[in-house]
């Protein structure tokens, strides 16, 4: 028989008087040390550091994360990509881990590593005769897989993060036409997120890529930016609208840069565009 309000109150008083007897029944279970979450997203165009990864087409993305109460974390993430950008491949698989620490309520920090893998993709599968690989050409065997170490700090709404490539940066080295290897390439990320009422937020981001080599006479360094308006909903749902772009059309846009597909289609990889995203976290 369910307890009436009066009986519930009496039971509470009884436990107060007999704590030794009732304590084990009322004791809260300790929080588990690990928290596991997953996410899935649909985006109208996948941009990485301002550069088009899907040839202007949509992407389905998803990931899973494990976070320990001590601050350590690890996760995986994946997305479809275009074979025009990563010849021979159509998938990006990322893996990462690290530690998030907190100094006080306003100041926190992070250190970690992040890997990018593109199964099946290789420079030797590119279309010879493109802007990146003008004919006649003999394309080398070179993957795009990359690993970075990173560290960052956050103060209230503002964060800064530095990523340093521990490998050649997405296959850029002397074999692929660069003046030297590109390990040590830097990516600076400054992000400001302003929370708004009703679970809205506005985020502004500026990034700077400093590639440790030139491509012929062209400097591939560039700045990217993103302005995002986002909204979270009940049940883990979220949506956003972003304006995204990047500089250095000399390197990332035809006729001196960019990429060409096997059918001759060209793409300005850094053009400013709107990106719509809908996702859910579980």
Predicted segment positions?
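Structural signature of outer-membrane beta-barrel channels/translocons
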Residues: 65-71, 100-102, 152-158, 193-195, ...
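Residues that define the transmembrane beta-barrel architecture of outer-membrane proteins
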Residues: 34, 56-60, 89-93, 143-149, ...
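Transmembrane beta-strands of outer-membrane beta-barrel pores
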Residues: 42-48, 78-82, 101, 115-119, ...
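Repeated loop/turn-to-beta-strand initiation elements of outer-membrane beta-barrel proteins
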Residues: 70-76, 105-111, 157-162, 198-204, ...
């Amino acid at each position: 028989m369910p307890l009436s309000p009066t009986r519930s109150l009496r039971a509470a008083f009884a436990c107060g008087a007999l704590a030794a007897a009732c304590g084990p029944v009322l004791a809260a279970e300790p929080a588990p040390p690990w928290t596991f979450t997953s996410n899935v997203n649909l985006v109208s165009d996948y941009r990485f550091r301002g550069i088009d990864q899907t040839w202007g087409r949509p992407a389905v993305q998803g990931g899973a994360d494990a976070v320990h109460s001590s601050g350590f974390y690890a996760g995986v993430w994946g997305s479809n990509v275009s074979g025009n950008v990563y010849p021979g491949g159509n998938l990006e698989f990322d893996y990462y881990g690290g530690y998030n620490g907190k100094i006080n309520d306003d100041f926190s920090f992070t250190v970690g590593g992040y890997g990018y893998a593109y199964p099946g993709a290789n420079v030797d599968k590119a279309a010879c005769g493109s802007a990146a690989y003008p004919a006649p050409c003999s394309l080398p065997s070179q993957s795009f897989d990359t690993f970075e170490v990173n560290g960052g700090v956050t103060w209230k709404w503002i964060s800064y993060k530095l990523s340093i490539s521990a490998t050649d940066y997405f296959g850029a080295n002397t074999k692929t036409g660069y003046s030297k290897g590109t390990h040590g390439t830097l990516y600076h990320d400054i992000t400001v997120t302003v929370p708004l009422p009703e679970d809205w937020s506005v985020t502004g981001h500026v990034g700077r890529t400093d590639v440790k080599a030139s491509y012929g006479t062209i400097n591939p360094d560039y700045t990217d930016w993103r302005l995002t308006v986002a909204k979270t909903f009940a049940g883990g749902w979220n949506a956003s609208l972003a304006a995204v772009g990047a500089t250095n059309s000399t390197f990332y846009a035809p006729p001196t840069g960019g990429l060409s597909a096997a059918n001759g289609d060209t793409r300005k990889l850094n053009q400013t565009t709107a990106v719509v995203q809908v996702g859910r976290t579980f």
